[in-house]
Amino acid sequence: MTENTKYIFFTLIAYKLILITIGLWASKKTKSFTDYFIAGRKLGPWVAALSASASSSSAWTLLGVSGAAYLWGLPAIWIFPATLSGFFINWFFIAPRLNELSHSRHTLTLSEFLSLSNNGSIKELRILSSFIIIFCFIFYIASQFDAAGQSFESTFGLSKTFSIIFGAGIILFYTLLGGFWAVSLSDTLQGVTMALSAIILPVVALNQVGFDLIIADIGAQSFFSTPTGVKGFAGIGFILGTMGIGIGYPGQPHVVNRFMAVESKEKIFQARIIAIIWAIIIYPGMILLGWAGRSFIESAQNEQILILMGNQLLPPV
């Protein structure tokens, strides 16, 4: 293990200990089903905004968006309005209404909320919605664990299987221990870390590579083409398909249940500003990082570009 790897390893251990501490603290705050499932409906704007943003973006943003920008070049710019539209849909249309109705109906889960009608609860709808959520989450969680496994594998040389089991064990421990409070606070910490990464690393990369070199690299591409340079209907189809990312945001139950947990509608209005500012920092930052990487490093795995550039440009911690 190199000196740099040792620093990264001890930083990771410290982070895991913080997560366990959050779980222990949250377990003392959890005294009822309402506390466990939606934090007693007491989430403030900062925790709600940052935890919802981080859980909606997580690994696919850090690794996927930067990797797409590295691989695609200029056409990756469309990821930004696509994701930002998802934030607007969630925070301006879904969040206020869901918060108000879930409070008035005293529902704890999204499945329970969806199953309610004027004539009471529809059992079949609750079962169906629960099945859909569980089925889709199998693939979503698998992709998150795979991303974590890739990070461990490339940084420490550990097997992906061991890395996934280790990470899953920590997550399972603090989640079962502290419930929604633990998840929300750990996601808030993740959101802050992501924002710092999206500010610091692209700035350092830009300083290293130079803005002129980035412009020269992507300048030959068209805004209205596919990543392979095809224009016309194919380019329009690519743009529309990419913009479709925003439609998926209201369909993420682990995100919209934050809206149910926010203390009041007024706090929703405050949280939406924080969340949108966060998105404006994160997505352009990751796109810029990917563009800088095209002129700085050669990688067969485009999704590793953030990790590779971080290892080369930043101190180990």
Please provide the spans of the model-predicted regions.
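Membrane-water interface regions at transmembrane-helix termini and the short interhelical loops
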Residues: 68-72, 97, 147-155, 168-191, ...
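Transmembrane-helix boundary/entry motifs in multi-pass membrane transporters
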Residues: 37-54, 96, 100-135, 263-266, ...
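Loop-to-helix junctions at membrane interfaces in multi-pass transport proteins
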Residues: 2-4, 38-43, 64-81, 115, ...
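Membrane-interface "cap" regions at the ends of multi-pass membrane proteins
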Residues: 1-62, 175-178, 191, 197-203, ...
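Juxtamembrane interface elements at the cytosolic ends of transmembrane helices
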Residues: 18-33, 89-111, 145, 173, ...
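Extracellular loop-to-transmembrane helix junctions
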Residues: 3-27, 43, 68-112, 194, ...
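Helix-loop-helix module between adjacent transmembrane segments
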Residues: 78-175, 241-248, 294
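Hydrophobic alpha-helical segments and their helix-loop junctions in multi-pass secondary transporters
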Residues: 21-22, 26-29, 91, 95, ...
